[in-house]
């Protein structure tokens, strides 16, 4: 028996060594952790239970029978994050470059199936050179099996992708279908075709970092939700994100201890909105002052900065936040901000996360680039996302709520439950100046008359009371009491239930 146990430990030690110490040292030399080190940092200490440690590939072409490392380049299993079960796979770049084989894919599919059966999130750590060319179509078939699991798990359990090395070719489509993608600066890359192919086909000279690095995907393409300085920071932030999320679509998000009085009054909010309606202010200040202990987890911070998305807690419960940012493009909606917010709203709705919308929006950004780029269809995505949402929704209008953008941003007309407005709110078709120039175009040559007409319009419409008179705003509240009012509103909506008409699926304007 002793010999058998020793043999088992020898096999385990060899499997844990991956591609060998030389390749582990090379991985560390690039500033990267190994697959197992990443899993250990991601999960609670000692909680990881590994599956299929000794699985090997079955390929015999190109002398592959002589290279059969245990585990086949991916570490899979389950563990806990703050005591809650998650399933994880971590590709091992030290083993055949982390390349994806048939059995490599089967290991990933196995834990994804288990995650769906048991209602737990899936976290994938990607660090792979791509398909294992020696296996040909078997490798591609493996990709397809993983893709199908991504699709079936979407909206059922949260899926999080961590890009911690190369992720190229067909491999990029699995992370692309997950809920969140995180990258590491200077060491992670995502692209369908690499720099060499780009140069051959288009004659463009571009580096891997420029083509598919963390900066590109967080600021330009919006493929990634955040980028971090190193592996350790990225893993810590994913642990933090998981703590905001439910395990699956049938559970509520976790309730965490809080020490911040939900009835806290914040007098500084009374002066947050400047007297001049054209002067910007930072909407994040309001978000931090509403949140328990001021804690805000922002999603896609570097992309479409004219809208803010992320998670806070109120009374220890997760709330998704969507807010216009007056500091950028005056808070206008455009193509990018509409796409960004729509995807976030749909995620929250899929996983029963209540939505708080903070509005200061003068309209949709005008211009040929927006119209040619399809702002109509992209703006409709956000409209559609809010209109189909059935989670508790609370809206606060802080200043401007003009035109179609007002309707799109979780208005009462889209079934928002509570719609509050500050006294500084202006709910109108458009700003006073633009409206006056249309209504009184015959007086445009008389500055005094135009000034008087503008003042009259402002007095009549540049306030929240017309909308309040019609029931489109539930109450005009004091800014200082916003946290209290919002917290009480969400507390009253915890048992909300909405019946939707039967449909096979919707047809959102993609």
Swiss-Prot record:
Ligase as UniProt keyword: yes
Keywords: Ligase
Every CoA carboxyltransferase C-terminal domain range: 261-504
Catalytically driven reaction(s): propanoyl-CoA + hydrogencarbonate + ATP = (S)-methylmalonyl-CoA + ADP + phosphate + H(+)
EC number: 6.4.1.3
Spans annotated as Acyl-CoA binding: 292-325
Gene Ontology molecular function, alphabetical: propionyl-CoA carboxylase activity
Residues annotated as signal peptide: none
Region (Carboxyltransferase): 1-504
Phenotype when changing residue 120 to P: Loss of solubility
Limits of the CoA carboxyltransferase N-terminal domain: 1-257
Pathway assigned to this chain's UniProt record: Metabolic intermediate metabolism; propanoyl-CoA degradation; succinyl-CoA from propanoyl-CoA: step 1/3
InterPro entries the UniProt entry points to: AccD/PCCB (IPR051047), AcCoA_carboxyl_beta (IPR034733), ClpP/crotonase-like_dom_sf (IPR029045), COA_CT_C (IPR011763), COA_CT_N (IPR011762)
Enzymatic class: ligase
UniProt xrefs under Pfam families: Carboxyl_trans (PF01039)
Keyword hit for Magnesium: no
Subunit structure and binding partners: The holoenzyme is a dodecamer composed of 6 PccA/alpha subunits and 6 PccB/beta subunits.
Function: This is one of the 2 subunits of the biotin-dependent propionyl-CoA carboxylase (PCC), the enzyme catalyzing the carboxylation of propionyl-CoA/propanoyl-CoA to D-methylmalonyl-CoA/(S)-methylmalonyl-CoA. Within the holoenzyme, the alpha subunit catalyzes the ATP-dependent carboxylation of the biotin carried by the biotin carboxyl carrier (BCC) domain, while the beta subunit then tranfers the carboxyl group from carboxylated biotin to propionyl-CoA.
Family as reported in the entry's similarity comment: Belongs to the AccD/PCCB family.
Domain notes: The beta subunit contains the carboxyl transferase (CT) domain.
Protein name: Propionyl-CoA carboxylase beta chain
């Amino acid at each position: 028996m002793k010999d058998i146990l020793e043999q088992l430990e020898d096999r385990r030690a060899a499997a844990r060594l991956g591609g060998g110490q030389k390749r582990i040292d090379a991985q560390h030399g690039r500033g990267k952790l190994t697959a197992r080190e990443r899993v250990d940092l991601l999960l609670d200490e000692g909680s990881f239970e590994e599956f299929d440690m000794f699985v090997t590939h079955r390929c015999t072409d190109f002398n592959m029978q002589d290279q059969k490392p245990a585990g086949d380049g991916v570490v899979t299993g389950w563990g806990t994050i703050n005591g809650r079960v998650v399933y994880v796979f971590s590709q091992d770049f030290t083993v055949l470059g982390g390349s994806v084989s048939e059995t490599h894919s089967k290991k990933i599919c196995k834990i994804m199936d288990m995650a769906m059966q048991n209602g737990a999130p899936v976290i994938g750590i990607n660090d792979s050179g791509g398909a294992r060319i020696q296996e040909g179509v078997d490798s591609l078939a493996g990709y397809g099996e993983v893709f199908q699991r991504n699709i079936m798990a979407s909206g059922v359990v949260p899926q999080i992708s961590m890009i911690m090395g190369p992720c190229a070719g067909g491999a990029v489509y699995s992370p692309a279908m997950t809920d969140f993608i995180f990258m590491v600066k200077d060491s992670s890359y995502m692209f369908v075709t690499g720099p060499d192919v780009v140069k051959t086909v288009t004659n463009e000279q571009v580096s891997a970092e420029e083509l598919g690095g963390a900066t590109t995907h967080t600021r330009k393409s919006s493929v990634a939700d955040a980028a971090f300085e190193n592996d350790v920071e990225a893993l810590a932030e994913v642990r933090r994100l998981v703590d905001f999320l439910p395990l699956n679509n049938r559970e509520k998000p976790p309730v965490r201890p809080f020490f911040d009085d939900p009835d806290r009054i914040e007098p500084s909010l009374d002066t947050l909105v400047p007297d001049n309606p054209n002067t910007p202010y930072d909407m994040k200040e309001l978000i931090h002052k509403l949140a328990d202990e001021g804690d805000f987890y922002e999603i896609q911070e570097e992309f479409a900065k004219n809208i803010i998305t992320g998670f806070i807690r109120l009374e220890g419960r997760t709330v998704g936040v969507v807010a216009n940012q007056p500091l950028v493009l005056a808070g206008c909606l455009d193509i990018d901000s509409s796409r960004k917010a729509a995807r976030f709203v749909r995620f929250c709705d899929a996983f029963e996360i209540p939505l708080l919308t903070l509005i200061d929006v003068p309209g949709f950004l005008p211009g040929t680039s927006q119209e040619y780029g399809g702002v109509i269809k992209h703006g409709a995505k956000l409209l559609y996302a809010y209109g189909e949402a059935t989670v508790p929704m609370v809206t606060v209008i802080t200043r401007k709520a003009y035109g179609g953008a007002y309707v799109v941003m979780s208005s009462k007309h889209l079934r928002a439950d509570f719609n509050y407005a500050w006294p500084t709110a202006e709910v109108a078709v458009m700003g006073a100046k633009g409206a006056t120039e249309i209504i009184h175009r015959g007086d445009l040559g008389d500055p005094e008359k135009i000034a008087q007409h503008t003042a009259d319009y402002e007095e009549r419409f540049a306030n929240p009371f017309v909308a309040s008179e019609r029931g489109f705003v539930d109450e005009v509240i004091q800014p200082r009491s916003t946290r209290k009012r919002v917290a009480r509103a969400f507390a009253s909506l915890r048992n909300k239930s909405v019946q939707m008409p039967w449909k096979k699926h919707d047809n959102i304007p993609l």
